[in-house]
Design a protein with these regions (language model features):
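NAD(P)H dinucleotide-binding glycine-rich loop of Rossmann-like/cofactor-binding domains
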Residues: 15, 46, 57, 79, ...
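Active-site donor-binding loop signature of nucleotide-sugar glycosyltransferases
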Residues: 8, 23, 99-101
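Extreme N-terminal starter segment of soluble prokaryotic enzymes
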Residues: 1-2
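Short beta-strand-to-turn element immediately C-terminal to the catalytic PLP-Schiff-base lysine
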Residues: 6, 48, 71-72, 98-99
Length: 106
């Protein structure tokens, strides 16, 4: 799966790399989203520079605003979400992303 990732802090234009990574693993309470679109905003830039209050461990995939379709859900998540178009928070600069159910909205 292709994903854009930050391996070192700095300006996104200099630090973003397109990586081939393993498919994300679905866990209980989580949702797999096939990403259709992602929004990058100023908080993403600050996070890439290490200047935002949330500091994910490196490497990480930015993209705080994600839109797509749910392709699978983990144990404990309503199966009715599968196939639904959603917006979600976090890690969206990838082909697919696994997120906590509470970060996905219909």
């Amino acid at each position: 799966m292709r994903t854009w990732r930050i391996h070192e802090l700095g300006d996104p234009i200099d630090q973003l790399t397109l990586d081939e990574v393993a498919e994300p693993e679905l866990e209980p309470g989580r949702v797999l989203v096939e990403v259709d679109a992602v929004g990058l905003a100023f908080p993403d830039v600050l996070q890439c520079r290490g200047e935002y209050q949330v500091k994910p461990p490196l490497p990480y995939c930015p993209g705080s605003e994600t839109a797509g379709r749910v392709s699978a859900v983990g144990d404990g998540v309503d199966q009715a979400l599968v196939g639904q178009r959603v917006v979600a928070l976090g890690g969206g600069l990838a082909e697919r992303v696994v997120l906590p159910e509470g970060s996905v909205f219909t």
